[in-house]
């Protein structure tokens, strides 16, 4: 049986978050939305890719370490969903600007044997107390992009932990806890900061300086992490270990508290 799947993952983190545009009255004049000159993430280089075919399985992701995590799972006899879970969790560590357990996702799953396509909507949702004025300033004007995104204001209710748990129950082969061995080890022992992650840190120095926790992690000694630096994240390992041991339930309790 062969499977293929596509993911569109969004992390509600300091470096990248999903922010909803403020609602405006129908009869009001359009209000320009300030983006604080926030440009899309810059590329770190172009590489010509050649077509590659595989007889049995293949793993691909936005980071080599995450790809290795997926490949190792497939090599052990895991399903495509097993590999996805290992890769997505690893991406939360190695590319925090774009992925994370605190975000949401769409998942498109193709069962080649049954010739059936199944889609999952696990996008993060706004908190219960959110109102249309959430991203308006004290004057009722739309907040600047970075002021709206950075910090807890833009955080939604995460969907990824529950998604991973649910699709594993449906399509997983390997034991749930075993899928998190790689990201836990990388977080505890250290992983190499990629050029892409380093570039994202350089582009977001001011927002990262606003909070002691982000400054300490991404800007040790006041300087941005350089590509090639070995970085450890024991707090991430602790969260993933909770996910491995207790499923998505802690993300509605222990972790979020």
Identify the role of each PLM range.
Residues 1-9:
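Bacterial N-terminal signal peptides that target proteins for export
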Residues 23-68, 72, 80-81, 85-257:
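Noncatalytic scaffold domains of N-terminal-nucleophile
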Residues 16-17:
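C-terminal motif of bacterial Sec signal peptides marking the signal peptidase cleavage site
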Residues 20:
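Short, conserved catalytic or interaction motifs in soluble domains
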């Amino acid at each position: 049986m062969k499977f293929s799947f596509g993911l569109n993952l969004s992390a509600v983190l300091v470096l990248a978050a999903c922010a909803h545009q403020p609602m405006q009255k129908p009869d009001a004049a359009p209000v320009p939305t300030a983006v604080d000159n926030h440009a899309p993430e810059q590329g770190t280089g172009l590489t010509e890719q050649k077509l590659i075919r595989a007889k049995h399985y293949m793993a691909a992701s936005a980071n080599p370490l995450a790809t290795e995590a997926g490949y190792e799972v497939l090599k052990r006899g895991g399903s495509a969903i097993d590999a996805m879970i290992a890769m997505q969790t690893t991406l939360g560590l190695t590319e925090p600007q774009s992925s994370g357990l605190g975000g949401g996702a769409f998942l498109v799953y193709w069962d080649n044997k049954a010739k059936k396509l199944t889609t999952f909507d696990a996008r993060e949702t706004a908190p219960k107390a959110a109102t249309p004025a959430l991203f308006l300033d004290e004057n009722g004007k739309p907040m600047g992009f970075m002021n709206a995104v950075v910090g807890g204001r833009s955080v939604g209710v995460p969907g990824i932990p529950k998604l991973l748990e649910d699709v594993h129950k449906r399509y997983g082969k390997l034991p749930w806890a075993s899928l998190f061995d790689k990201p836990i080890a990388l977080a505890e022992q250290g992983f190499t900061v990629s050029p892409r992650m380093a570039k994202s840190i350089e582009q977001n120095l001011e927002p990262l300086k606003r909070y002691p926790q982000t400054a300490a992690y991404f800007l040790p000694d006041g300087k941005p992490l350089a590509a090639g630096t070995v970085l450890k994240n024991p707090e991430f390992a602790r969260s993933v270990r909770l996910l491995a041991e207790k499923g998505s339930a802690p993300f509605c309790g222990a972790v979020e508290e």
